[in-house]
Amino acid sequence: MKMNSKMGLALLASTALLGAAGAAAAAGPDFDGIPQSRRPPASQPYIGGAWTMPTRPKAVKTVDGKEPPLLPAARAEYQKRQADLKKDPKTDPIADCLPHGPLRIFYNQYPLLIVQESDQVDFVFEANHTYRFVDLTRGPPQLNDDTRTSTYMGYATGKWQGKTLVVDTMGFNDKTWLDGSGLPHGEKLKTEEKFTLKDANTLEGVVTITDPDNYSAPWSTSFTLKRLANYQPTEMVCVNDHKM
């Protein structure tokens, strides 16, 4: 895949900010490596820096603590996956070093870095070198506007609604699970993520899942990320016998 100029700039900014992520938590925004013209306005909440999820449930529930509204065929597939996992944990797609995919990527045990710019927000996950670029200059993603194909992490666009970053993503393939227990999804999956800074060191995420092939209605789940101080990233390379 050819890297466009925005991706290149984002990767450069990500590299520059990795070393300063810990300092940013204590000293406020650190925009080293980001040109002045691309820095977010001072009035915008600063979600940049390193984050981790202190509590990582294996099975994702809805915001009211219930099982997602699976359709009959999806429920049968879910139950099969759970039975297979009991027999052999390596039936999990990530055992073959595949990306975690949507939603589940936030529940892995490795930290992530958020790079915040005026026109783009980038999520750089230590897990398996996974990254997401969220374009803030376009409307909701449309797959029929070019030659895009389905991918593990989809195509994301975002916007700020007051103090909340709203990210719309679609264009996923169906090769990943939504959580560690085997929740399925298909290629019609669309996600809406809302990220709200609750305080300087707490970021709340609310994700709404819409997938008419697997769920009878849209459903939402939530999680909490905590800012990391003195974060020193390490290289995380998946190998066939690696447990993520």
Positions of predicted regions on the chain:
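Bacterial N-terminal signal peptides that target proteins for export
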Residues: 2-12
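Bacterial N-terminal signal peptides
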Residues: 10-20
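PEST-like low-complexity, intrinsically disordered acidic/proline/serine-rich tracts
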Residues: 24-244
